[in-house]
């Protein structure tokens, strides 16, 4: 069959499900069976299709239904027998039983109440039963296709005939899905033929003959040879008469084929069931109502055949069973009153949106005429033929073409000539083969080598990939790409104009040559057609209209009627325009080339379009503060939800991979600050000290001499580019964390930095790893560090891109050198040779120094920003966008530095850091950080008090493997701080004394009397051992401390926190101290049984003595009786069982009580 069925469509939608798409709101509730509506053949076919699909996996049930119909037709059973057997056969499918009511005679009806028992209604008298029985036979036989009873035809043959008829009708319905009028006309032909057969029963036949039916169907299916051939199997006699010309009319469009040679036995076989007229039994005369319209019983409350047909169509178009079940689930939500009608339309719009007819029918069922929220999608399906082919399983070429299956019957084409039937060695990649387009496609298709040029394509069809099926999202074109597209469009339009004009000139020149060879009399008689002597009517007309405008029709008419006079004039004008336009093209080429050169590099860079705007917003102070606050809020939310333990972890982490970039960043900032008249000279000196001494100390970098750094910056600015030092060549080892920095006591004093004598450079040594610096900063310092890190990261990107391009250039040069040596010719750049590319003014080795010089020029205003960006694009191509806002970034950093040197809080932050660094509280070795915990806590507390009105940031600089990692953490300073300075000093001193070692008591026994923390026995052992150690020390026999710790495992990992507001200490979970000797666990396992036995014996001895002193014999006996359940008074009957087991080698008695039932009371 042509579809995959929809058996559950009726049950899914028309079942007994309360308020649903059936019943009063969905279907049409019938009356008690006193009125019948006309039933059509498609209703019967739809019902049979439902039965076949529902029992597709159970053919015995379907064949049983066909057998019931056969027996009913032969009057072997009556109408109640049919009802009873059909009800038993479909007892698990109430929708099919209710649907069967449509074919029952008047007065009969099957109802299914809520209790599930069948309620069969029938006429009251037997006479009515007999008449209705005859009616029912006629009624059902009118609707259900069948065959005449032949005893030699088996039941299986009947099933095949039914299947063939249903499959054929469904095939027609699918084929002409886009032309429903053809399908309706076909059904009308069947209705007319059957009705005439009934009306002429018992009288001379005056209706349509089989030959007339076949002729009308052939005219209806013009061009559909496969459908007509299959229809001929149902009317073999009529088809044969038409083919042989003996019928009432001949079909000239249908040619003879293999059906002309019909075997003899096929002529004698019974007529198939599709068009067989209905005949009454010959031996029993009945009261017939055949002259009236057919009637249908009132349809039950579970749905109508129209609804069943709708769901069958939905299942066929959705194809996937899973998708169809999801569609039914949406309707189930509506049945359960969980969604409204409008919401149901929204739910089913993804399923039915591509099928407007089904969607409109669905809305009509709901009573909704119009869907305002989502217009249905246009149906993009192809013709009916393409729906019958599974292109997914067909052979393919690429992603756009599929091969038709070999079983596919080609449509008839009347426009092909003999050349189309030659050897099949060429093919065309075209998907059109119909009558109207064959010849046009034959002319305009492209040929593929390897196949014969004389054959049209009948195999490969175009298989489109819809844009909405693709997940690729194309980016929006930039303005520079649009400019390139406009240039290409203009060039294309001009080329089309020139080529059109040139083609017209060639055509008219050929006409002029032809006229020159004619006699004068022939020239006067010569006329041109609409093509004006060429092969196209359009090209010449366009060229003439372009030149003459409104006068073009007159010129064209003159060329046709008087070509001798008109052709030379028009040809001269065309050639003049050709020269004029060629000269204009040369001028346009220069303009287009300039536009290409300006927009080409810009069009390649998609990120630079929005980078400057977004970067300006991202580098604002508010954006930087919002970034870390959002991370802080996220951590707090995770902690409050219990997803993470409260811990001190950084909110932002940045990596400085190359510390040499710090010098370049400092040089750029100093260069800009030095040339700002708004910054006072004193502030400039302080800024230089921060950049060249304070900041490098945070990053464990070399501290530069101020005077030398400024002179080197000026020399680099004034020196030629070829002598600028590379950052990689200027690298020097950085000092370690313990190297003595220059005297920082007067770093922010009144004396300018240039007056201080230069310090000797420190001795180079290998930088240490796992060292850190701790710095508590306020908002302004946080902004500066973030901007400084952004500047360094962008400088590093530019530097690495320059190194990468240099490496690629050298690799390419080596490859070209090897190739040139093999060919023995000089290698050169083709773009250079063609003068399409100008040599770069900057060598690749100098790209990074040249970039720094351009940034300096941009900062001082000696270079235009547009020129700066274009030069960067030429140097770094699509990676240059990171340097476009370098001037704005340096200006923001200079503005923050001015705040740092002019704000008192910022200066106090630096002074506090320098003081704490001298105390060892601002960094050191990472492994000994626990030693500095108290001092760092004190430093943090002082910093929070200093920045009471601002945010406090904990910034750590960690040096590891040649890199510096900067972490930033926003601290919570909202807890109440004490205002009493005496109490504050006392707390700081207490914390430092508690955690530190220098404040510990010298005597181990001091303070133990108030709250002893040791057991007395351990304390005694310690005193004896301590005295012996002192005696050995006096004799010089004491062991060294490391010998005493041999074989001892220990760890000091306990962590604690102090609440400054409450002076309470809180220990951190999963942190502890431990110490034990190696081998003690093994020895403990060996001696454990002995220790347990000794403890058990001690306990037994103590217990025996206690019993003798405190318990009498009678009391012990009573307790023993009670325990064993032998005491009867006020006790539930029970019995105690004693079991002796051994636990760790010791006998242990276990008691278990078993309760018995209490005897029933009298």
Curated annotation (Swiss-Prot):
Which cell locations does it reside in? Nucleus
**Gene that produces this protein:** SIN3B
Residues bearing Phosphoserine?
709, 712
Briefly state the modifications made to the protein after translation. Answer: Ubiquitinated by RNF220 that leads to proteasomal degradation.
- Region (HDAC-interacting domain) location: 446-572
Residue ranges for the region (Gate loop) are 430-446
Tell me if Metal-binding is a UniProt keyword of this record. no
Q: InterPro entries attached here?
A: HDAC_interact_dom, PAH, PAH_sf, Sin3-like, Sin3_C
Renumbered residue ranges of the record's region Disordered: 1-29, 246-284, 706-765
Where is this chain compositionally biased, Gly residues type?
Answer: 1-21
**An annotated GO cellular component:** autosome
Tell me the segments the record calls region Interaction with REST.
59-105
Q: Where is the composition biased (Basic and acidic residues)?
A: 253-265
This chain's function reads: Acts as a transcriptional repressor. Interacts with MXI1 to repress MYC responsive genes and antagonize MYC oncogenic activities. Interacts with MAD-MAX heterodimers by binding to MAD. The heterodimer then represses transcription by tethering SIN3B to DNA. Also forms a complex with FOXK1 which represses transcription. With FOXK1, regulates cell cycle progression probably by repressing cell cycle inhibitor genes expression.
Q: What protein name does the entry list?
A: Paired amphipathic helix protein Sin3b
The alphabetized list of GO BP terms reads: negative regulation of cell migration; negative regulation of transcription by RNA polymerase II
Residues of the region (Middle-domain) are 394-430
Species for this entry: Homo sapiens (Human)
- Which UniProt keywords are present, listed alphabetically? Nucleus, Phosphoprotein, Repeat, Repressor, Transcription, Transcription regulation, Ubl conjugation
